[in-house]
Regions:
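Membrane-interface alpha helices of multi-pass inner-membrane proteins
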Residues: 81-97
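Perimembrane helix-loop-helix junctions
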Residues: 102-126
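Membrane-interface transmembrane helices that cradle and orient dolichyl/undecaprenyl
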Residues: 65-80
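Membrane-embedded helix bundles of polyisoprenyl
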Residues: 32-47, 56-64, 85
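Membrane-lumen/periplasm interface segments of specific transmembrane helices
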Residues: 121-156
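Transmembrane-helix motifs of polytopic, lipid-linked glycan transferases
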Residues: 5-25
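Membrane-interface helix-loop-helix junctions at transmembrane boundaries of multi-pass membrane enzymes
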Residues: 185-206
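Juxtamembrane membrane-water interface segments that cap and precede transmembrane helices
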Residues: 1, 149-172
Length: 207
């Protein structure tokens, strides 16, 4: 039961951050917890998600990384925000190496948010490297260098990542449901996007 309790605590934290993310950046025009309610509903109807997975921790880091990326919007001193954003990207990529691919998207969005400068780029690079530097120190001290090499070796093994045949029917059903929700949300965002502020439209286009 310990892993389930930890898993539910992580889900509760993610739900709280979803509410704060919306309230902080006005992604939805009103203060709402609908996104958290839908998230909890999906978790509830999927018994397999009640256990603790690596992806739970990575998802929390992903959400915090988005928060700091959004905070960097049109900031003249954005190096600190991008440092923290890429720190959580780097930390998450240790557990899920393919997470590193998001770094490219994050840099493109930082450029679109007018927060990418040579200084902030160096801050982002240092933020991504810091978790690996800490991992290297641990691996070197305990003579377990394979632990440091493992994320880089797994980074290129993405063959099974897109293999839908290994998914169970309930997993495919959830993916289909999420796809429908994405299409409906995207159409609504395009149709009603002119009513939002420029900053909000930039956030929604990223999401």
């Amino acid at each position: 039961w310990a892993d389930r309790i930890v898993s539910f605590l992580i889900y509760a934290t993610i739900g709280y951050f979803l509410i704060e993310l919306n309230n902080q950046f006005s992604i939805i025009r009103m203060r709402a917890s609908m996104q958290t309610a839908i998230y909890f509903l999906l978790v509830t109807v999927c018994p397999k998600m009640h256990y603790l997975y690596t992806g739970d921790i990575v998802a929390l880091g992903f959400l915090i990384s988005i928060y700091f990326l959004f905070k960097s919007y049109q900031q003249t001193q954005a190096a600190g925000y991008l440092f923290y954003s890429f720190f959580f990207i780097g930390a998450g990529s240790i557990l899920f190496p393919q997470f590193t691919i998001l770094s490219v998207l994050w840099l493109l969005e930082a450029y679109r948010f007018q927060s990418l400068t040579p200084r902030s780029f160096c801050g982002a690079l240092l933020g991504w490297m810091l978790p690996y530097w800490m991992l290297f120190g641990h691996a070197f001290f305990y003579n377990e260098m394979e632990l440091f090499y493992r994320p880089f070796n797994q980074l290129l093994t993405i063959g099974e990542f897109f293999n839908l045949q290994i998914l169970q029917p309930w997993e495919l059903a959830i993916l289909g449901y999420l796809l429908v929700m994405f299409i409906v949300s995207a159409v609504h965002c395009i149709a009603a996007g002119f009513e939002d502020k420029i900053r909000t439209r930039a956030y929604l286009q990223f999401l």
